[in-house]
From Swiss-Prot:
Alphabetical keyword list: Aminoacyl-tRNA synthetase, ATP-binding, Cytoplasm, Ligase, Nucleotide-binding, Protein biosynthesis
Function: Catalyzes the attachment of glutamate to tRNA(Glu) in a two-step reaction: glutamate is first activated by ATP to form Glu-AMP and then transferred to the acceptor end of tRNA(Glu).
Protein species of origin: Pectobacterium atrosepticum (strain SCRI 1043 / ATCC BAA-672)
Keyword Cytoplasm appears in the UniProt entry: yes
Motif ('HIGH' region): 9-19
Protein name per the record: Glutamate--tRNA ligase
Motif ('KMSKS' region): 237-241
Gene behind the chain: gltX
Length: 471
């Protein structure tokens, strides 16, 4: 049997982390089994579905490289198919027209609530032979079995049973003639030959209704796996406050797709004590049997730790391709500074995100207007004038501009003056970066370049001279 899974988001908002994890699990299960992965857009909610949301879903899937083999299919383009099946069900008696008014249904609901009963349709129009005009408003309901139970073996949670008496006759076509979500899903899974439905636990209550419709149609019933929800680190429902933002916001915030995928796969699944997984390892090891039944807690610090790992362990050239977007957003012209791959090597250890890297690299490409006040007050004092003058002289004399030769110039200055490296290195760092923190001063000066470094030292010496006149 060919394994076939699907990811079927509703385009009423962005692709959030819960949806992305569901997509990842469905994708990994298919890839692990050499199966196929289908993308389906469930856009039956015409009022809330938007093109912007569809675009956001596509962007998120593409950024995460969760490629699909079929689709994207759109439910709004399949209404003729759904209605044809409903008409067939009306003919063979597995569905019926319901003419109950909104007022009757509201009164029924109130009566049931007063008695403490679960609100459900009472089957008033089931088997009715009353004559109605063709144009009289009505819905179509599925004739749900009234005896027995629906039992399915959830691949994550084990056997789950629902009594058919607890399930009312589901509306499958609205008064306006449009098919409903639960029905469209069933026909799609049947037509697309989906073998495994992996989705959030909020769909568990839909499953027995969908199974009954499939059985009434004589269609094969797929296997189901319902993934637990994601909570915030405080145990409450995940919200924006915890980091529940769209997938592309993680891109904007400077995360690598590998880091987010690694984080999401571990958010409910494990393989021993291993924490770091490449995409190939995920595909090789993933199993629904190892997915947790309990809810998982979202932890931004763990995601940042993974991102820092990938920034420093993926090839710098690859990381640079993702960094370039953030550099563009920062408005930096990188033609007169170090290659971005070199920048990754310089700043990787210091930065948890690519956005942080882009924000902290400006001095490599642009001259700064003024020195950081605290750093200048501490390190650009009159006592720093002699070390800066001497190290400038040595840097200007370098004919082969390498980090090693720059290091020798700094060390030589310190030795010549009988001072520690810090007495030379710190004023030099502030002089060339404008700040008190940077990667190693030798590699920083090398990346900034010879002429730009010398000009900035001159600026620092002028700053010190002005400071001396004010004393």
């Amino acid at each position: 049997m060919k394994i076939k899974t699907r990811f079927a988001p509703s385009p009423t908002g962005y692709l959030h982390v819960g949806g992305a994890r569901t997509a990842l699990y469905s994708w990994l299960f298919a890839r692990h089994q050499d199966g196929e992965f289908v993308l389906r857009i469930e856009d039956t909610d015409l009022e809330r579905s938007t093109q912007d949301a569809i675009d956001a879903i596509m962007d998120g899937m593409n950024w995460l490289s969760l490629n699909w083999d079929e689709g994207p299919y759109y439910q709004t383009k399949r209404f003729d198919r759904y209605n044809a099946v409903i008409d067939q069900m009306l003919e063979n008696g597995t569905a019926y027209k319901c003419y109950c008014s909104k007022e009757r249904l509201e009164a029924l609901r109130e009566q049931q609530m007063e008695k403490g009963d679960k609100p459900r349709y009472d089957g008033h129009c089931r088997g009715s032979h009353e004559h109605h005009a063709d144009n009289e408003p009505h819905v179509v309901r599925f004739l749900n079995p009234q005896e027995g139970s629906v039992i399915f073996n959830d691949r994550i949670r084990g056997p789950i049973e629902f009594s058919n008496q607890e399930l009312d006759d589901l509306i499958i076509r609205r008064t306006d003639g449009s098919p409903t979500y639960n029905f469209c899903v069933v026909i799609d899974d049947w037509d697309m030959e989906i073998t495994h439905v992996i989705r959030g636990e909020d769909h568990i209550n839909n499953t027995p209704r969908q199974i009954n419709i499939l059985k009434a149609l004589g269609a094969p019933v797929p296997e189901y796996a319902h993934v637990s929800m994601i909570l915030g680190d405080d145990g409450k429902k995940l919200s924006k406050r915890h980091g529940a933002v769209g997938v592309m916001q993680y891109r904007d915030d400077g995360y690598l797709p590998e880091a987010l995928l690694n984080y999401l796969v571990r958010l409910g699944w494990s393989s021993g004590d291993q924490e770091i997984f490449s995409i190939d390892e995920m595909k090789s090891l993933f199993s629904l049997d190892a997915v947790n039944k309990s809810a998982s807690a979202f932890n931004t610090e763990k995601l940042q730790w993974l991102n820092h790992h990938y920034i420093n362990h993926l090839p710098a050239e690859y990381v640079a391709t993702h960094l370039s977007w953030h550099i563009e957003q920062a408005g930096l012209d990188t033609r007169t500074g170090p290659q971005l791959s070199e920048l990754v090597g310089l700043l990787g250890e210091r930065c948890k995100t690519l956005k942080e890297m882009a924000d902290s690299c400006r001095y490599f490409y642009e001259d700064f207007a003024e020195f950081d006040a605290d750093a200048a007050k501490k390190h650009l004092r009159p006592v720093a004038r002699q070390p800066l003058e001497l190290v400038r002289e040595k840097l200007a004399a370098i004919t082969s501009w390498t980090a090693e030769n720059i290091h020798h110039a700094i060390q030589g200055t310190a030795d010549e003056l009988g001072q520690g490296m810090g007495k030379v290195g710190m004023p030099l760092r502030v002089a060339v970066t404008g700040a008190g923190q940077s990667p190693g001063v030798d590699v920083t000066v090398h990346a900034i370049g010879q002429q730009r470094s010398l000009a900035r030292i001159d600026k620092a010496l002028a700053f010190i001279a002005e400071r001396e006149t004010q004393q």
